[in-house]
């Protein structure tokens, strides 16, 4: 049984396939699983089992996603593949499947297509940090020059959306050829795996990031002071450290004088743990749900930002009618709703249920935020959309 234990010690990296419909994303996913299982051990998966993606619900939104896993000698990968374009849009915006890197699949026979562009743009908006290109169906193109032309187009498209188009690895292969066991194409899958290992840096673990705890509840304990409770989102809070209380009101700083979990006193609270944090000299009314406790200076409160939004369809329990400029819903960040106004892109008059769109949001109260923060859009407690902070304006 020692082998199983060893596997868990490898760094864990989340990736996924993106790209235009029918360019071979699912075939490539199957090919990676099959070839790597053959070479490094692991479970092979066939096309049908990946394509038959189960439906999941993330914040009330129905998304079909396939999750597969594979290993290289250096790492363990969790890989997501979505059957339909709408699933990708929802997946990226809700962050249902966070990606440390994306594999952009482009058919050499077609070159970049509309969804190729849309997925690159979405990747930029939602913060996929690295993209590797797999040019697929190269066995169907005889002309070297055509392959070079497609590669150039893809690199230019990546650069247009602020990815380092000149430096992204581009692998030319045939997913179907590799799946059918043709040696020259299997080699290209190994080359892709090496690019994943070398080009996507090991992600920072939540525990190594600066401390953040979204406040869920506030209690006053006689003779001891004020306790806030919540789940530590990232980092570590230690007794005796300074912490900032950020969002909704003016930012204040105080000292953590105690951490407790299940009524036991601890020296520290770590990412993923539900804890109570005792705050020195803080009154019950100084703190409220929706604020965050954080390492001072690590995160700042903002009211205005651009975002990428997915609006739930009627079938998903969303609105039945479009909304227009001047729409004022609640934006649910972490643990609380804040009212905000929206500004639609130039030339867009209305937004229909089922659409995805970039918009600027202005909140009536500041919220601790960073680019990449996910939120829900609600009307009277009902979720009508999901979004992600793309860039902070003020």
UniProtKB/Swiss-Prot annotation:
Binding residue positions for Mg(2+): 26
Region G2: start-end pairs: 60-64
Annotated protein name in UniProt: Elongation factor Tu 1
Source organism: Photobacterium profundum (strain SS9)
Chief location category: cytoplasm
HAMAP family found in the cross-reference section: EF_Tu_B (MF_00118_B)
Quaternary structure note: Monomer.
Region entry G3, spans: 81-84
Annotated keywords: Cytoplasm, Elongation factor, GTP-binding, Hydrolase, Magnesium, Metal-binding, Nucleotide-binding, Protein biosynthesis
Cellular localization per UniProt: Cytoplasm
Binding-site positions, GTP: 19-26, 81-85, 136-139
Region (G1): 19-26
Family according to the record: Belongs to the TRAFAC class translation factor GTPase superfamily. Classic translation factor GTPase family. EF-Tu/EF-1A subfamily.
Molecular-function GO term, any one: GTP binding
Protein role: GTP hydrolase that promotes the GTP-dependent binding of aminoacyl-tRNA to the A-site of ribosomes during protein biosynthesis.
Assigned EC number: 3.6.5.3
Reaction it catalyzes: GTP + H2O = GDP + phosphate + H(+)
Occurrences of domain tr-type G (ranges): 10-204
Entry superkingdom: Bacteria
Chain segments carrying region G5: 174-176
Region described as G4: 136-139
InterPro entries in the cross-refs: EF-Tu_GTP-bd, EF-Tu_GTPase, EFTu-like_2, EFTU_2, G_TR_CS, P-loop_NTPase, Small_GTP-bd, T_Tr_GTP-bd_dom
GO CC annotations, alphabetized: cytosol
